[in-house]
Amino acid sequence: GPRHRIEHFGLAGPEHLAKARDLGIIAVPQPVFLNELRANYERYVPDQWFCRCFNLKAMFDAGLTVAFSSDGPVVRQVDPLVGLRAALKEPLCAGNEVGLEQALWAYTTGAAIAQGDEGNRGRLEAGYWTDFVMLEGSLHEPESLSVSRTTVGGTPDL
């Protein structure tokens, strides 16, 4: 079933991350915020907190279960690929970006865990629901990616 989670978790410091990990709380940040709200963070977040602002890498490093989401329809770009690009290439501070495997895990397995459905979703394995997207481009060049096909419940959406 549903799990305890903190949506956004945008200004978490080391003490908050450790406490969340110890309590088994799932972090659900929105990487698209790094792209879409960057000017607001640069203008309003105090310098001493800036590098902790949506520090996705720190969430993984703290040992949290992390599930990425889009926060749609609040954001203009309800597009996981924009969020993926931001997680990989657009941290607010150098060194806070996450790796490709972490980002894909957070959008798939992490998201399934966060919604309490990891027994059905989040993996391409026998017995799991067949929900996935096929991407064109290079995963190592996220700006080149586009969705070429989606499949939901085993049915392709052409």
What is each residue range found by the language model?
Residues 1-4, 9, 14-21, 25, ...:
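His/Asp/Glu-enriched, well-ordered alpha-helical/loop segment
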